Amino acid sequence: TPKPSSAASDVYKRQFLWWGAVGGTAVWIGVIPFTGGLGTDDLLAFLLGVGVSGVLHVAYMAVLQRGYREGNLSTVYATARGTGPFLSVIVAILLFGERPSVLALVGVAAIIVGVVAIGLVDRGRAERQDRSLDLGLVFGLLTGVAIAIYTIWDAHAVRTWNLSPVAFMVGTMLLEIPFYSFGVRGRWAAVRTLGRTQWRRIVAFSILSPLSYILVLTAIQIAPVALVAPLREVSVVLVSLFGVFALKESRPGWRLAASAVVAGGIVLLAL
């Protein structure tokens, strides 16, 4: 059953996601004219690309939040962040005909293993001994599948139709707003309160979250998905290192070793 505190947390997350979509659209829409416009004259292709992407991203977020509600955060996060890149690599090889070198594939494997190890560092002994079905693991896997699906679709869209990453991101966020609006229906007073009290966090999120994916889309246009997808997970290492040196979190040896494995994988990709 869902955790008792999950209801209030879910409401907050939906409200924050609404502000993120609205704020991200407002921040980045003005950048479109300076970054190549839509990138294509085919308006139908643009609408199809962002329309499908918007639905996929909302579905991904819904599955992820359900996973956080049903299971341990570290389990869901590690499983999703390991499964997503792995499936993206497999599909990119099968559908896009990408052929990474053996060395690069070893690097990809190292990154995925290291990321999963970082995510599982805080799993309790009791959890590991529990033989019952781990819903966190199930939803982590489903989230990984969702990550792979939207990654492959977005790569196909920006490559095939030469769409501008900025315009694509803005279009996707714009289409997410109605979905998130449905999620916060009847709670608009609370949404406004959140906007007043958390505006600094919302502004930062509205700038940085879209920027991170715009950079991913830009990389996908010039590099194989099989290499870009795993490299997205470098942020997990940075957070882990911050936890070791700034927050003095437990099991620093494990965290540093896992981070070193990821770093080694990145080096192999660069060779």
List where the protein language model places each region.
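Helix-coil boundary and interhelical linker segments in multi-pass alpha-helical membrane proteins
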Residues: 33-45, 91-104, 156-163, 218-224, ...
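Interfacial helix-capping/hinge residues at the ends of transmembrane alpha-helices
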Residues: 5-6, 61-65, 76, 88, ...
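Specific alpha-helical transmembrane segments that line the substrate/conduction pathway
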Residues: 56, 68-116, 167-174, 225-245
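Hydrophobic/small/kink-forming positions within alpha-helical transmembrane segments
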Residues: 29, 54, 58-59, 82-90, ...
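Single conserved hydrophobic/aromatic residue that forms the stacking wall/gate
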Residues: 1-8, 12
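Membrane-embedded alpha-helical segments of multi-pass transporters/permeases
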Residues: 29-33, 89, 93, 116, ...
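Juxtamembrane helix-loop boundary signature in multi-pass membrane transporters
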Residues: 86-145, 155, 250-271
